[in-house]
Curated annotation (Swiss-Prot):
Residues that, per the record, bind NAD(+): L16, G17, A18, V19, N39, H40, T154, E364
Membrane topology value: Single-pass membrane protein
Record-given protein name: Pseudopaline synthase
GO molecular function, one term: oxidoreductase activity
Superkingdom of origin: Bacteria
Family annotation (Pfam families): Staph_opine_DH
Induction section of the entry: Is part of the operon cntOLMI that is negatively regulated by zinc level through the Zur repressor, which leads to transcriptional activation of this operon under zinc depletion.
Reactions catalysed: pseudopaline + NAD(+) + H2O = (2S)-2-amino-4-{[(1S)-1-carboxy-2-(1H-imidazol-4-yl)ethyl]amino}butanoate + 2-oxoglutarate + NADH + H(+)
Cellular localisation: Cell membrane
Record's keyword annotation contains ATP-binding: no
Function: Catalyzes the NADH-dependent reductive condensation of alpha-ketoglutarate to the intermediate formed by the adjacently encoded enzyme CntL, namely (2S)-2-amino-4-{[(1S)-1-carboxy-2-(1H-imidazol-4-yl)ethyl]amino}butanoate, leading to the production of pseudopaline. This is the last step in the biosynthesis of the metallophore pseudopaline, which is involved in the acquisition of nickel and zinc, and thus enables bacterial growth inside the host, where metal access is limited. Therefore, this enzyme probably contributes to Pseudomonas virulence.
Length: 433
């Protein structure tokens, strides 16, 4: 472990799931001061506390070519109650679902967190930085940083062992925006993530970074549609696969068309907020999963934004067809490559109280898109494609609630009113213009 980085100081991880375990390992490798975690009280937190009391530490296993990421990290302190926090922390890292940022920030005892200099949002959506800043108390001078998305694919291996996680993939590149463009924390986090082989590209504004959250462009058209929801909300039949072509998965010409139209709507929102939109195909290929140039020539990728709608949809369809298998995996004896797209949908399940709950995909995607649509209304944008996807989700979930009975469903299944949060984002944006 390196010497402590004074620009980080003591770091508190807010939320202690798979993401936090990866971040903790990166911080320990880089060199932070004290490392603590806060997790909301509940059965899972109790299991964490019991494991820590037995002397357990955070354990990360890297899979395949990422095996070198494996390691352990000890926590100096673990809290289940925000009231227990003291003014010991200089950096807060929000490792919670993005749709809970506002509630989490409002629930922190800021009167005892006067030393906080930096807040990092690990997977921010458009407007998240402004939303968090709107919730900070008057006089708080903390810099808020937005990562475009979480930089790895990490999951807890076994819920009975909540301190063990597996990282099976790492992004090549993520983007970082700051509420203070000249803050040294941007360079600090660039070095932290470089330890896992991730390039961090600083952008001029938080919104520019947030506009490069890949799930906003991909999850919404694929997983808020009829095919995906029918599988997610059903206990019977095959689960379906998230990234396969119909009839095995949700990818159809219609879903690709929805992706292109949503990209156009999000691009206009970014422009009105003063951020540069992205070339969607270049972003998907260069920053996420590339395909062979035989399938997508470089000129087609670079010229995507200037192409006509029909050509754009054709190129996007070709990309997803090319990723049905991992195009860079070695072929087996039969000449077959790794079945890259065979990621089954997670389905609704009952929680420990016996209530039906949705998995994070599509619940978080719905909530994120609903907030973006409410924000867009302040900029006189109708976003018909986004609204159509929201309606698809709401109708499917409403039918599920009617079938199962309201008393059997967790409140999180019901639609939320995103307007108050959108109002707060817009007011904060206006105050910074």
């Amino acid at each position: 472990m390196n010497a402590a980085d004074e620009s980080l100081g003591n770091v508190l991880l807010v939320g202690l799931g798979a993401v936090a375990i990866q971040v903790a390992l990166d911080l320990r490798r880089h060199g932070a001061g004290r490392l603590g975690a806060l997790n909301h009280p509940g059965r899972r937190s109790q299991r964490i506390a019991e494991a820590l009391a037995r002397g357990a530490c955070l354990q990360l296993e890297g899979q395949g070519q990422h095996r070198w990421l494996s390691g352990n990290a000890a926590l100096d302190v673990f809290h289940q109650d925000p009231a227990e926090l003291r003014d010991d922390w200089q950096t807060l890292v929000l490792c919670v679902p993005a749709d809970s940022y506002l509630d989490v920030v409002r629930g922190l005892p800021w009167e005892r967190l006067g030393g906080v200099r930096t807040l990092l949002l690990v997977s921010a959506f458009i407007g998240a930085n402004l939303l968090v800043r709107s919730a900070l108390p008057a006089g708080c001078q903390a810099t808020v940083l937005s990562l475009s998305s979480y930089y790895a694919a990490t999951k807890v291996i076994d819920e009975t062992q909540p301190l063990r996680a597996l990282t099976k993939a790492v992004k090549r590149r993520v983007y970082l925006g700051s509420s203070r463009p000249d803050c040294p924390a941007r360079e600090t986090w660039r070095r932290v993530l470089a330890g896992s082989g991730v390039e961090v590209v600083p952008l001029a504004t938080p919104e520019a970074a947030e506009g490069r959250n890949v799930t906003t462009y991909v999850h919404s058209p694929f997983f808020l549609g009829e095919f995906a929801l029918a599988r997610i909300l059903s206990e019977q039949g095959p689960p379906g696969f998230m990234y396969k072509l119909y009839p095995e998965g949700p990818i159809t010409p219609g879903a690709i068309g929805a992706m292109r139209r949503l990209w156009c709507e999000l691009s206009e929102l970014l422009r009105r907020m003063g951020a540069e939109p992205l070339n969607l195909l270049r972003f998907l290929n260069d920053d996420n999963y590339p395909v062979h140039e035989t399938m997508l020539p470089r000129a087609a990728i670079d010229g995507f934004a200037e192409a006509g709608a029909e050509r754009q949809e054709y190129l996007l369809f070709v990309r997803y067809a090319a990723l049905l298998v991992d195009p860079f995996s070695p072929a087996d004896e039969q000449g077959r490559h790794f079945d890259f797209s065979a990621v089954p949908f997670r389905r609704v399940s009952r929680d420990e109280d016996g209530l039906w709950r949705l998995p994070r995909v599509p619940l978080e995607d719905y909530r994120k898109l609903a907030l973006i649509v409410a924000l867009a209304a302040h900029f006189d944008l109708a976003m018909p494609q986004a609204r159509s996807l929201l309606a698809s989700y709401e109708n499917a979930v409403s039918r599920f609630i009617d079938c199962q009975g309201a008393s059997q469903c967790h409140p999180s299944l019901y639609p939320i009113d995103s307007r108050p949060a959108a109002d707060a984002i817009y007011r904060q944006w206006c105050s910074t213009c």
